[in-house]
């Protein structure tokens, strides 16, 4: 099956060619790589088409390009051109991504389309694929399109095409989503997959090898956005004063420079910045505790941190703010915080470290549920069911 994966992927070439600090998504790109890699291993031909959007406005045109450092030799990645001028940026990104999708389809027709979230380029391409190309579309739903990151519904105005996005939810033929809340927004009749995260072979192997050499580390990994709670975590760690333990911080984003200043000359905090995948796996498997101090959401399940699954698979105990209901087996390896206020974070860290709660993990369950073999079977089943559903519905909307 030839698959177009239309997603805001950000590979090495894009990060070098365009200023994307403000909209960088590290975990999202990792998950896209995992999905595309598994589908390729199952003999599907996958192409990633990314808008490569630049949100920092400037009068500069960025030409389309192909990723020169692909994560997989059989998964080509194409980026649309960008023109980040006020009032034009979004329309340009949408139009150029759409034209790139049409061009790739004309050269070699696709059999199925996967879209990642409901940004304008994804909505436009999916609508065209359904109405004009008679192709089934699988919706990968990671972030609730109808509320903001804090779960407030006042953000409905940011849904890219208004009612068209809502209509698209009733037009797709399959869905994989990060939470039951997100899946509930789709029609009950279509094939669905609860897909919280994924565990790669690299993480599985390192986790097994390093199970007995855990260090007194607390690890934060992720994009440095205000909503991630990293500033509160650093403030809490300074107040905690836990001898023999270190806080390790990886990632990159708009707060990176501020965070570097905050941790300067603090021997209890190790700031790694943006690291390679190999180094990140080593850090995750070395830490006894990993932490996800996200801002509290008013709509539980509107997002789910992919890294929680990786943390647990690495054999770490996870401290997190609530992100919607989870399976009991997963929660066995977690400690919840009611919010990410520094005092709350301090209390949670004391509970986990001094009470040795860090010994309680959910490693094996997560590997069994979200390891490569399990996810590969579930993905393949979803694609088969989606194709069958599309045919059974007799949909045909070719222009």
Q: Residue locations for each model-derived region?
A:
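Nucleotide-activated donor-binding/catalytic signature segment of Leloir-type glycosyltransferases, i.e.
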Residues: 258-282, 289
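N-terminal subdomain of nucleotide-sugar transferases
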Residues: 1-63, 174, 232-241
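Nucleotide-sugar-dependent
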Residues: 226-228, 278-282, 288-310, 320-328
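A short, active-site helix/loop in glycosyltransferases that binds the activated sugar's phosphate group
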Residues: 52, 59-61, 148, 158-194, ...
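A short, well-ordered alpha-helix in the C-terminal region of glycosyltransferases
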Residues: 356-369
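Conserved donor-binding/catalytic core segment of Leloir-type glycosyltransferases
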Residues: 4-6, 209-238, 248
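Membrane-proximal helix-turn-helix segments that form the acceptor-binding/catalytic region
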Residues: 33-37, 102, 121-124, 128-132, ...
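Conserved acidic donor-binding segment of nucleotide-sugar-dependent glycosyltransferases
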Residues: 332-343, 350-356
């Amino acid at each position: 099956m030839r698959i177009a994966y239309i997603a805001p992927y950000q590979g090495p070439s894009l990060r070098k060619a365009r200023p994307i600090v403000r909209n960088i998504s590290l975990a999202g790109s990792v998950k896209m790589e995992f999905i595309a890699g598994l589908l390729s291993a199952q003999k599907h031909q996958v192409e990633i088409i990314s808008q490569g959007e630049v949100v920092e406005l400037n009068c500069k045109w960025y030409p389309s390009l192909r990723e020169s450092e692909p994560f997989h030799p059989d998964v080509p990645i194409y980026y649309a051109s960008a023109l980040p001028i006020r009032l034009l940026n979004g329309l340009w990104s949408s139009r150029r991504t759409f034209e790139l999708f049409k061009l790739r389809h004309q050269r070699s027709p696709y059999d199925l389309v996967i879209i990642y979230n409901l940004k304008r380029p994804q909505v436009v391409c999916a609508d065209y694929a359904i109405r004009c190309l008679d192709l089934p579309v699988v919706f990968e739903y990671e972030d609730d399109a109808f509320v903001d990151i804090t779960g407030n519904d006042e953000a409905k105005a940011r849904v890219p095409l208004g009612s068209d996005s809502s209509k698209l939810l009733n037009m797709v033929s399959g869905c994989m989503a990060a939470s039951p809340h997100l899946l509930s927004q789709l029609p009950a009749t279509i094939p669905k997959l609860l897909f919280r995260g994924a565990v790669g072979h690299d993480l599985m192997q390192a986790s097994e090898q390093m199970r007995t050499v855990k260090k007194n580390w607390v690890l934060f990994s992720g994009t440095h956005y205000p909503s991630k709670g990293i500033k509160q975590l650093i403030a809490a760690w300074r107040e905690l004063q836990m001898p023999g333990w270190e806080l390790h911080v990886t990632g990159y984003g708009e707060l990176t420079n501020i965070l570097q200043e905050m941790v300067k000359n603090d021997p209890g905090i190790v700031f790694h910045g943006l690291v390679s995948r190999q180094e990140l796996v080593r850090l995750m498997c070395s830490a006894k505790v990993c932490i996800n101090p996200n801002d509290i959401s008013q709509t539980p399940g509107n997002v789910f941190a992919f890294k929680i699954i990786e943390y647990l698979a690495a054999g770490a105990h996870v401290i997190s703010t609530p992100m919607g209901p989870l399976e009991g087996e997963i929660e066995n390896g977690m400690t919840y915080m009611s919010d990410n206020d520094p005092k709350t974070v301090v209390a949670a860290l004391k509970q986990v470290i001094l009470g040795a709660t860090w010994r309680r993990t959910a490693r094996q369950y997560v590997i069994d549920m979200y390891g490569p073999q399990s996810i590969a079977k579930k993905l393949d089943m979803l694609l088969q069911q989606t194709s069958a559903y599309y045919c059974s519905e007799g949909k045909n909307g070719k222009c």
